[in-house]
């Protein structure tokens, strides 16, 4: 990172924003052709024929009109999708977002200098906070290197949403408050919020214009910790953020109505750089087994998470750390970036603070004392109960495959991401006896304010290969050829999607134009094959590559009978995390992971033996 920083001295983090190309609108014909191809694995002959007719009718009729209107919209906006995506994918959603939408991940420090150890929470926390604050300062000064693909700069806009950002609940639609500014843009908030035992505190991280040091941060954390443990538990207002969105919006309005000062306190949390959570539980965590960390990050005490914050940094009693982040303002690659930066710093310093132990005379943290009544306390009680009940239904399997990793797949000329995606397809096919419609995230950051596109990994080629693997009469050579066809197809789709040639966001745009124009929903979107193939947020497999660093994350499944599957890739291993719901009797995250590891071996075996 330091070398990168040195190299990028002349480049400012956000300097290329204005020169990025606008998000393109793909060709209607191409999108519909790709869509038809994607429904094939889920249709019999008659169903496919019917869908083909529906698509043709759409292409020649209303689809053409909607596409023209979409092109018109795109003329006036550098990103025709941005506002729509934010609303439809996040802000209009009414289910509790802390459990169902947020992404979480453990900090990887337990793999090296910070194994789980009781009594380390506050000291480690102060060091971790300091590195996070240094990253914030780099961003404020625009010294964070611009992300690039080769020499092409990628969109950096989401980095504005990492700090001092919060979702605010609304009756029908939430909104996002963002208070971050770069130094050249002016003043921005400089305080963090700390949640501990149902109470909330804030303190400034600058003193005399400089960041406060780890010993000073430790003084602040110790003050809060001792106060909370020596006095009764607080009203746990934060738990309300884990509620159903409209219920939380009404509770928030009521809270503000009780006392206008409550709004001032809420705004202090909203505008804080991030929330630091002090948990009093200790999840089991070793490099081989850290499922419990994920369970506690997603389903832990809602009284010490502000579910709507773009960044909750969570500390556990045994010195294990992690994060819970609202997904609305940004995608997980941001968290991967800051988490990796912090982890590298901890490795450099052997997990210790080596600077001055001096503690200056800095103001003590300020407690945010909300005015509450019986109704609010009852709302808090209900919120906690619903969150903990829903979270107890979650099954998480986090596991590390150590037989081989990227090094071997590259040697076999197989793209490691595609390798894992196809292993997942085979595992699902073996476990459930049918193809599983699958969403893999592709990034579209080549374009202005680009975020994501859907790669539909369950291709005709992938299914043919899965079938051959289960067919005793198929030769090794035939299986290998089918697998390589599936690889080629997936790699092409990923390239297309990253370069603005996907079709899922395009179809969403056409549907939203119809809605805005007050037109009936086109038949294409009512067709059973639309949802059976994953359309309308119905993907049974919701997946994402977290990257090639030491960082791991997870999100809950998109549908009740589905899985969330997230993974990162290293030279010598694949680290995977799978989520499912216990109340769904047909899914089992642990079994699926077992089958995936089995598939990894089968695939490499195929490459090694097929040419003998």
From Swiss-Prot:
The record's account of tissue expression is: Liver.
Write out the residues that bind CoA: 406, 410-417
Q: Which GO terms describe its molecular function?
A: carnitine O-octanoyltransferase activity
Q: Which domain of life is it from?
A: Eukaryota
Q: Name one GO cellular component term.
A: peroxisome
Q: Which UniProt keywords apply?
A: Acetylation, Acyltransferase, Fatty acid metabolism, Lipid metabolism, Peroxisome, Transferase, Transport
Q: What residues bear N-acetylmethionine in this entry?
A: 1
Q: What class of enzyme is it?
A: transferase
Pathway assigned to this chain's UniProt record:
Lipid metabolism; fatty acid beta-oxidation
Q: Which reaction does it catalyse?
A: octanoyl-CoA + (R)-carnitine = O-octanoyl-(R)-carnitine + CoA; 4,8-dimethylnonanoyl-CoA + (R)-carnitine = O-4,8-dimethylnonanoyl-(R)-carnitine + CoA
The record's subcellular locations are: Peroxisome
Residues with N6-acetyllysine modification: 406
Give residue numbers for sequence motif Microbody targeting signal: 610-612
Residue numbers bearing the N6-succinyllysine modification: 40, 57, 406
Please, one GO biological process term?
fatty acid transport
Under Enzyme Commission nomenclature, its number is: 2.3.1.137
- Give the annotated active site: 327 (proton acceptor)
Where does the chain bind (R)-carnitine?
439, 441, 452
Briefly state the protein's biological role: Beta-oxidation of fatty acids. The highest activity concerns the C6 to C10 chain length substrate.
Similarity section: Belongs to the carnitine/choline acetyltransferase family.
The protein here is known as Peroxisomal carnitine O-octanoyltransferase
Gene behind this protein: Crot
